[in-house]
């Protein structure tokens, strides 16, 4: 990933927060000379050293985990927004401005392995459910479904673990603009009712 220093974020707490809010990862591995790309939610351990998730047993990622080259990259996509040059004060002064795109992503690289343990898989799925259900003010739990059905569904999946080798963020949030232009972006984002632009605004207001 192209990563200018002023966009680089290494703080684990900041990276973990984005991953927690946007857990759906684009997971890329190499299988027989071609890229194997999947999309799945992952959970980061508190120490930032491991990711856990689950996939269908028929997913080609199983073969990726079983081969010698088990290196994968997980990409987490946070807020993103088109930034119009009309928001820059310098547009009126010189006209020397162009559009750009602000965004925040986290890249994790590491080795993929499988966890084929029924007890672990059940515990993992329960943990993931308990983590995300409160967002919808719901108290649904795995135990609410018929046990026979749960067992059938759990048998169809396998756990995965990624041992993190590197974890870095790229938060392109207009840091390379002048203070007045940065302020212009923030002020105009504040006027927008669009959810994605509000998410970008919240991120720009956080200390990086």
Predicted regions and their residues:
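Binding-site signature for planar aromatic cofactors or substrates
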Residues: 1-208
